[in-house]
């Protein structure tokens, strides 16, 4: 028996709403930290799920650190985050597997249209979890002839692009406000699990 848990997460929208919804359905608590500039509508949608929600005066990556620190200080506190770092990889891997379901559904829809293999796959990236899941799925689906993968980031939060440009296999971090109109992509630190996939399989 796990007892009463408190789920901690950082988000600027959909992920936090999902965590709050799941916590509510499971009879648990949720604490959601949103970065500076998050929309009031998204805040209210998360709050409607019963979560304790705050909009902080820091960027997304700092909100992730805040959520992790608070979880560590809370009895039965659990970080539910879709980005991974050293020592925190299991839950992000589960979330990426969930994202892979969308890739599977897309592949099935393509087959229904008699398109057996896409030539190119375009996917957006924040920390890279969704992108890593999509690239990983299609790479495994077509191991001998995978599509060309193109990942798009917000210009002000281009951590994956900078890592690719460096060419040494190491991830790069972008700091600051990460100001962009692309809600959900204002992330300056890549998921280490997805980085290992993307750096080996993405064309652009």
Question: What do the PLM-derived regions correspond to, one by one?
Answer:
Residues 2-8, 17-72, 159-173, 194:
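Active-site-proximal loop->helix
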Residues 5-6, 78, 120:
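Structural motif
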Residues 13:
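Conserved catalytic/binding loops enriched for acidic/polar residues
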Residues 16-17, 132:
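Residues forming the Rossmann-fold NAD(P)(H) cofactor-binding site
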Residues 30, 53, 78-79, 149:
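Hydrophobic beta-strand scaffold residues
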Residues 33, 56, 82, 152-154:
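Generic beta-sheet signal
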Residues 61, 66, 85-201:
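Glycine-rich phosphate/pyrophosphate-binding loop at beta-loop-alpha junctions
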Residues 73, 77-82, 93:
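Structural signature of the thiamine diphosphate
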